[in-house]
Curated annotation (Swiss-Prot):
EC number in record: 2.1.1.173, 2.1.1.264
Summary of the function given for this chain in its UniProt record: Specifically methylates the guanine in position 2445 (m2G2445) and the guanine in position 2069 (m7G2069) of 23S rRNA.
Principal EC category: transferase
Keywords assigned by UniProt, alphabetized: Cytoplasm, Methyltransferase, RNA-binding, rRNA processing, S-adenosyl-L-methionine, Transferase
GO terms, molecular function: 23S rRNA (guanine(2445)-N(2))-methyltransferase activity; RNA binding; rRNA (guanine-N7-)-methyltransferase activity
Domain THUMP: residue ranges: 43-154
NCBIfam families recorded: PRK11783.1
Any one of the GO CC terms: cytoplasm
Species lineage: Bacteria, Pseudomonadati, Pseudomonadota, Gammaproteobacteria, Alteromonadales
Record protein name field: Ribosomal RNA large subunit methyltransferase K/L
Catalytic activity: guanosine(2445) in 23S rRNA + S-adenosyl-L-methionine = N(2)-methylguanosine(2445) in 23S rRNA + S-adenosyl-L-homocysteine + H(+); guanosine(2069) in 23S rRNA + S-adenosyl-L-methionine = N(2)-methylguanosine(2069) in 23S rRNA + S-adenosyl-L-homocysteine + H(+)
Gene3D superfamilies linked to this entry: 3.30.2130.30, RNA methyltransferase domain (HRMD) like, Vaccinia Virus protein VP39
Length: 704
């Protein structure tokens, strides 16, 4: 009898144990990430051929208690490797685990390789060669605590490699996981019917439906594999293996002939459907699986009842989040409307996505797709599903529609193609919705502390689901930004690698906005009228823009014909952005872009440069490493304004703004400094922000 460790993905140990019981083995013991078995050679070949859930099959060659590196070397060098394989065969070593002496698996693999080579040489044989790509023999060695185990990888490669998937989609589903999903979904019950029906409406490259077909037609998962790790093992029995192989071929022939059901896969990507057909052809299943190009959210049920199993897109990338969310919602409606009397299994990367189906599951299983945590949910549509009321959408949809009808006319008249259509008008839906040409950007506000996170999430998702019916926007142009507290340089870092960059128009100016890569888009729309004031009043003036961000205020001052415009900001990213904004407007003149801490720069330039207009729009709070200290605008605004006054011409003005909600300007402190404050907040708030009166504070400050 031989001792094997049959490995599987974590979470599948129980299923693997049940499967191994079917092989009439005398000993099966379940453990973490697999099972130990004892088997004779014919049983071992049978497990290798027929296990659908195992990922590897390791024949244990030896194990030993070791306490040092020397003891590891001694055990592996003294083992008779020439009894396992010939010196003229190539091999490779897979090493896992480690201890105080072996901290890196690469070092461990090299150590084992040297021991094997030394053993062959010491036994009078030639040195065997290494082949990492296509070895004849694969040796697996593990060190865990003080235990050393060495094994022959019996199958030679991952058992998920069935031989049919030479090509795959962007997010491949491992064949072993696909088989486990089908078992969890209840495929055995479906196959007991006279005419079973199995359907995957998101089939991709066909893995789930091909695995289902292999089960339905008694096609062994190992039948189409080209290479096995035991073929060059000294104890391999070609006759026994031939018998197992011949039996598998005969069972498939009979199973295919006797199958009377319907297997179908569809996908909206023609390229992937073509791959799926090719994959099915490699295992001779192309004639029994129907593939078609179709939209899963608008597909017909292929029969009155059956088993639907699918792995819809996860939408891992930021730009895909909303589109994926809405896809699940539409798919959930389609299931409820069209697949009554069906059993459903959906694999998703996120519990929130499963919630969007609006179906009640009777069972959920956490699984791993490679290293990615996923969730499998089962739904029984043969039983009545609850109605999830959607009447609450009416108030939100009506409000957004009403706002859009009113404000779109106003925006067209003003020459604007970016504006705010909704700003937490209904408190339960706590977000801002901005129009950027034909895109919609949803910015979530932080929920009150007394609102549970799950409730806030549900409300946000519900808002997103309602947008496509409330606004003239396609779902792939809805972008979600989720607010998180920013620290250090996070606010300057890219949030996504998939850019959506537009050029928008504001009172004749062109500005670059980036809807996806950063927390903000590059344009603070609530300051639109302040920028217009600069456009109207800065001709022939010297203008300083502090905390300049993407220099949109500087652009309007320059367009007004300002004699000089200086923009100062700590962020190189934003200043480069500002330079692009100037280039978009074909502005050439005395324009400077200075990367510096505004406090330090003003102290250095005090008395050297004077300006007619200083636009001062600092952040509410900042603790950037580039700053000499922290900035709290409530605490520090008097000192900041007094410092700026040192660069102000005698009859100049400071345009001071900030976005702190409960900001209170210290008129007494500024009065003592000889400064006069004119509160222009209400006049500076544009039409589309009037519902949010605390969006910013704006003051014109001059010498008394």
């Amino acid at each position: 009898m031989y001792r094997f460790f049959i490995a599987c993905s974590k979470g599948l140990e129980g299923l693997l144990f049940d499967e191994l019981q079917e092989f009439n083995l005398s000993h099966v013991k379940q453990t973490l990430a697999g099972c130990y078995i004892e088997a004779d050679l014919q049983q071992a070949y049978t497990v290798a051929m027929w296990s659908r859930l195992a990922s590897r099959m390791l024949l244990q060659l030896g194990e030993k208690e070791v306490s040092s590196l020397d003891e590891i070397k001694l055990a592996l060098t003294q083992f008779s490797w020439s009894k396992v394989f010939d010196a003229n065969r190539t091999f490779v070593v897979d090493f896992s685990g480690g201890n105080d002496d072996i901290r890196h698996t690469q070092f461990g693999a090299q150590l084992v390789k040297d021991c094997i080579v030394d053993n062959f040489r010491n036994s009078g044989f030639e040195r065997p060669s290494i082949d990492k790509q296509d070895p004849d023999i694969r040796i697996a060695v593990r060190v865990h605590k003080d235990k050393l185990t060495w094994s022959l990888d019996f199958t030679g490669d991952g058992m998920h490699k069935r031989g049919y998937r030479l090509q795959q989609g962007e997010a491949p589903l491992r064949e072993t996981l696909a088989a486990a999903i089908l078992v969890r979904a209840g495929i055995k019950n479906e196959l007991e019917k006279d005419e079973p029906v199995i359907f995957d409406p998101f089939c991709g490259s066909g893995t789930l439906v091909i695995e289902a077909a292999m089960m339905a037609m008694d096609h062994a998962p190992g039948l189409s594999r080209a290479h096995w790790g035991f073929l060059f093992w000294h104890e391999h029995s070609p006759q026994l293996w031939h018998d197992v192989l011949e039996q598998a071929e005969q069972r498939f022939k009979e199973g295919k002939k006797n199958f009377k059901g319907h297997l179908k896969g569809s996908d909206n990507n023609p390229h992937l459907v073509a791959k799926a057909k090719d994959n099915a052809k490699r295992v001779l299943l192309h004639e029994v699986i129907e593939f078609e190009v179709a939209d899963a959210t608008n597909c017909e049920a292929p029969a009155e009842s059956g088993l639907l199993v699918c792995n819809p897109p996860y939408g891992e990338r930021l730009g895909e989040a909303v589109e994926t969310l809405l896809l699940y919602r539409r798919f959930g409606r389609q299931l409820k409307d069209t697949f009554q009397n069906w059993h459903i299994a959906v694999l998703a990367g996120d519990e929130q996505l499963l919630k969007r189906l609006k179906l009640r599951s009777h069972k959920k299983y956490p699984l791993l797709n490679g290293a990615i945590p996923v969730n499998l949910a089962l739904y029984d549509l043969t039983k009545e599903q609850p109605d999830f009321a959607e009447s609450q959408a009416d108030d939100l949809v009506n409000r957004v529609k009403k706002n859009h009808a009113k404000l779109s006319k106003w925006a067209n008249k003003e020459g604007l193609d970016c504006w705010r259509v909704y700003d937490a008008d209904i408190p339960e839906y706590n977000a801002a919705i901005d129009i950027y040409q034909d895109y919609v950007v949803v910015q979530e506000y932080a929920a009150p502390k007394d609102i549970p996170e799950g409730v806030a999430n549900d409300r946000l998702w519900f808002m997103l689901e309602s947008l496509s019916s409330a606004l003239p926007v396609s779902e792939d142009k809805i972008i979600l930004k989720r607010r998180q507290r920013q620290s250090g340089k996070q606010q300057y870092e890219r949030q996504s690698q998939d850019s959506t960059v537009l050029t928008v128009n504001e009172y004749g100016a062109k500005f670059e906005v980036n809807l996806t890569d950063y927390l903000d888009t590059g344009l603070f729309m609530d300051h639109r009228l302040v920028r217009k004031e600069l456009l109207d009043k800065c001709e022939e003036l010297d203008v300083l823009n502090l905390f300049a961000y993407t220099c949109t205020a500087s652009v309007q001052a320059a367009r007004a014909g300002a004699a000089r415009v200086v923009s100062v900001d700590m962020s190189k990213t934003y200043l480069k952005w500002g330079e692009r904004n100037f280039a978009l407007n074909r502005l050439r003149g005395d324009y400077q872009f200075i990367q510096a801490d505004c406090f330090i720069w003003m102290r250095e330039q005090r008395g050297k440069q004077l300006f007619d207009v200083i636009f001062l729009d600092p952040p509410t709070f900042s603790n950037s490493k580039r700053m000499s200290g922290t900035l709290d605008i409530q605490r520090d605004h008097v000192g900041l304004i007094k410092t700026a006054t040192g660069m102000l011409k005698e009859d100049g003005v400071i345009l001071f703004s900030n976005n702190r909600k409960k900001f209170r300007i210290d008129t007494e402190g500024l009065d003592k400094a000889g400064l006069e404050v004119n509160d222009q907040t209400q006049a500076s708030i544009p039409e589309d922000f009037k519902r949010h009166k605390g969006i910013h504070h704006y003051y014109i400050i001059s010498r008394a």
